[in-house]
Structure formats: structure tokens, C-alpha cells
Swiss-Prot record:
Homodimer. GO terms for molecular function: DNA binding. Belongs to the YbaB/EbfC family. Pfam families: YbaB_DNA_bd. InterPro entries: YbaB-like_sf, YbaB/EbfC. Keywords: Cytoplasm, DNA-binding. It is found in: Cytoplasm, Nucleoid. This is Nucleoid-associated protein VV1_2004. Binds to DNA and alters its conformation. May be involved in regulation of gene expression, nucleoid organization and DNA protection. It comes from the Bacteria. GO terms for cellular component: bacterial nucleoid; cytosol.
């Protein structure tokens, strides 16, 4: 069915892919991504594991409406989270040869 050495090679490839996936997960968890809203007036920096590192708010917003500022912070966080997801997909495609994850399946596994 697998030919001479076929099963052994298949297992070796699976192990190598698993090692690359583990390294990728560690790399993604350590990376930082910046999300923005309000044309860059609010910036949120998060890690690949979605931990917030920094929130930067332009001074000009300090005098504005509190509710608007809260909305901008939420939008900046959502932008950063979206960027993390995009980066994960790009890095994952490099390992899997472009094979996409099934819908709803996210890293880490």
C-alpha cells in the first residue's frame, strides 16, 4: 500500500510538520501587532496570543466624548485582533503549502 519506506517517510514528514507547527505557535505568541482606529489616533498593541501590551491615545482625544474614545479603543483592539488572525493564516500557509484550515478551526490546535 505505501511501498518500501513509504509509511516511515510519511511518519517522518508528519513529525517534521508538527515540529514546525510548534515553532510557529511559539513565534506567533511572541509577536506584537498594532491595531489602529480614528486614523491612527488610538493604537492598541497586542501579542499573537491576544494579550494587550500597550494602548496609545492621542492627546487630542482626551478632551472629546468619553463614549467615542471607548468606541475607538474597542475598534483598535478589534483591528489588532484581525491583524493577528491574518498573520497566523499567512504563516500557517507557508508551513502547509497553502492548504487552508477548515472554517472555524483556529491556531493553536
Amino acid at each position: 500500500m505505501f511501498g518500501k519506506g513509504g509509511m516511515g517517510n510519511l511518519m517522518k514528514q508528519a513529525q517534521q510538520m508538527q515540529e514546525r507547527m510548534q515553532k510557529l505557535q511559539e513565534e506567533i505568541a511572541x509577536m506584537e501587532v498594532v491595531g489602529e482606529s480614528g486614523a491612527g489616533l488610538v493604537k492598541v498593541t497586542i501579542t499573537g496570543s491576544h494579550s494587550v501590551r500597550r494602548v496609545n491615545i492621542d492627546e487630542s482625544l482626551m478632551e472629546d466624548d468619553k463614549e467615542m474614545l471607548e468606541d475607538l479603543i474597542a475598534a483598535a483592539f478589534n483591528d489588532a485582533a484581525r491583524r493577528v488572525e491574518e498573520t497566523q493564516k499567512e504563516k500557517m500557509a507557508a508551513i502547509t503549502g497553502g492548504m487552508q484550515l477548515p472554517p472555524g478551526m483556529k491556531m493553536p490546535f
